[in-house]
Amino acid sequence: MEEREHVVGKSVKRVDALEKVTGRAKYTEDLCDKSAYIARVLHADIAHGIVRSVDTSEAQKLPGVVKIVTCFDVPKYYFPTAGHPWSTDPAHQDVKDRLLLTEHVRFYGDDVAAVVAENEVAAAQALRLIKVEYDPLPFVLDVQKAMEEDAPQLHENYPGNVLKHTSIHKGDFEKAKEEPGLIKVEGWYQTPTVQHCHIENFICYAYMEQGRYVIVSSTQIPHICRRVVGQALGIPWGNVRVIKPYIGGGFGNKQDILYEPLCAYLSQTVGGRLVKLDVSREETFVCNRVRHAIRTHLISYVRPNGEIAARKAECFSDQGAYASHGHSIGAKALGSFPQLYPCENFEGDVYTVFTNKPVSGAMRGYGIPQAMFAMESHTDDIAVKLGIPPYEYRWKYLMPKGYTDGFSKNVNYYDTFRECMEKGSVSVDYERKRREYAQQTGDIRKGIGMAAFWYNTGVWPISLETSSCRMVMNQDGSIQVQVGETEIGQGADTAFAQMAAETLGIPFDMVHVMTVQDTDVTPFGLGAYASRQTYMAGFSIRQTAELLKSHILDTAVEMTRQMKENLDIIDGNIVRTTDGSVLMSLGELATEKLYSLTNCGHLTAESTYQIKNNAYSFGCTFAEVEVDIPGCRATLTNIVNVHDCGRLINPALAEAQVHGGMSMGIGFGLFEELKFDEKTGRPLNNNLLDYKMATFEDHPDLHGEFVENYEPTSAYGTKALGEPPVCSVAPAIRNAILNATGSGLNELPMNPHRLFVKFREDGLI
């Protein structure tokens, strides 16, 4: 019998590769008609206050100005913006705290008015002529100062500016810490506000057609966007159609509803005409979303052998001005502390707090990069204090094989951490270098460090996980695949095609995935976030492919008079399994079925799969640095990430994901920070000149390694990889600097200024 050719596990070329490298791929900007009106938003130039009046008289006189809308004109339907599945239980719904435009300004850059004009010049000039009078209010930028009794209040329903507070208790921390002979290790760890910096800034355009709102947007979450636009405008959700073309990156920023509702509303105000609303890079930094800056206080009581007797964690998560994804980021961060190094006596609290800063939302890693910086820096601090090699300490106390999380019921099926550590250690020659670097003196010193991470796949059991898929056989026997999960540049469509081809038994190039999603056409799906794409979509793809394959074989039975159990699809052909003979191609079968004068039919299948699983992804980072102590500079010279993300659907895509995440982690660790003027609340470096992203000169060669352990809860054995690569990079670099100098920095980024302060504090300079 003919052997089936496997597609899953091969580095096939991306389905969108040619379109993108030749410039033929159509992004939102490319699809918008040149006749579109241009919309621009007027942003507040104070950090906190009430809009007293908006004078648009001079702006209205400008030629080309079509419409000006102020915060006093818009409908008062409060809506959420987080890209989460909706809940029918009001207690579990996202916070509705946004209006299209606001009278109560809560951060420097808040939206107070909008202009619709015939062209860019008229729109820009009109913004400059609008005069806004404010009643200024005190503002607060520090997360813990915002919790003080006399701090200015941002939202009347949230006293103390606390959006939400969660506590975790396991065992008896207070009793356990009194055990004689324990060693106390304590530290504060701070991560910065950073921005996603995807290549394509947010853009959308909207128009009305047959009484419905049509929105084309660079969103990660088209079906969720549809719902939120309906909520924001107070209209039935079915009156909204959202189309997602190719996207130039999102990293979580576009997992929020940004300006789609406002754009739709502006179209309505000009008679349903086409209106385009895009934002500049400067606006993207401030008026979209940023990563939560989290301040973490860790206290560990350990026995002399390193065993953790008791641990306490406090996290203060800077939410910025509005709820967005809110407490879910801080809660996920806190939940990691008792799991990475299991501790029987744990006490933890996380506070998500409003401040007068840009809104924090989803960003690659969703709280885990912040948590891993604190946890893995703290772990090295423990190891150093006890005189235990950090590698040896982790080997002994990281989550063991068989560990089961009491909440999610996730199981660590393999001894993954140690497999990843061993592979990474060999790759960088870790033990030899630790011994060699221990003998260093002088101003220039080398160091090597490591850090581990874990990451959940998707959001179950916190929230809904579901995936839908539709497959249609074309006249030539090829298969059209429509999935609710979205391609946002990560290569998801290629993985979808590989999985579909694998189950159907057809060549990869016979699968066509619909990358342009349309809520009027595409099956319902939750979108791209939580590293869920391949894991979640895999369930509905496999289920739908099995249904379609069964329909195809039923048709083959009709045409060949063979028994169904003796038929299979191999390499796009109907094959008799008893002798391996090819009876017909799928093209012949499809044509015959579609055009039969006696029994014509269109072969399709559609299904929804509700997922009630989750899966741990694991891994670690090894980093090497060269530190110029007098110059207060740390140069990254080598870095290796090792991942267990289950079975690799496409090894080349997996490696690309790892490289991208490592690059983001390098920026997070060494360079990036959005700064604010303490006197005005104004952002100081919201541009790519002053916001220091890592460049090629700052990167050594990036190395990704994999430990492939088949994930038993997964349809194809795979699990999260999109976000994990960023999680452990910053603490690995920090620990390498600690190894080189004996100084451990507890605040990111580890730039020359912070190195100078720390080195001087520790007597190195």
Regions found by a protein language model. Give the residues of each.
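C-terminal catalytic domains of large/alpha subunits in multi-subunit enzymes
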Residues: C71-F72, G234-N239, Q268-V275, P304, ...
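Glycine-rich loop/linker segments at domain edges
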Residues: K10, D16-E19, D89-H92, G160-C204, ...
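Conserved catalytic cysteine-centered active-site region
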Residues: E103-H104, P236-G238, I243-K244, T269-S280, ...
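Thiamine diphosphate
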Residues: Y246, G250-L277, A492-A500
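Flexible, low-hydrophobicity surface segments
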Residues: M1-P159, G187
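Short Pro/Gly-enriched beta-strand edge/turn motifs at strand-loop
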Residues: P85-S87, E179-V194, L277-F285, G326, ...
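Helix-loop-helix junctions that connect adjacent transmembrane helices in secondary transporters/permeases
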Residues: E148-L233, L398-S478, L684-F696, H703-E705
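Extended active-site and interfacial segments that coordinate phosphate-rich ligands
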Residues: L18-E19, R128-L141, Q220, R227, ...
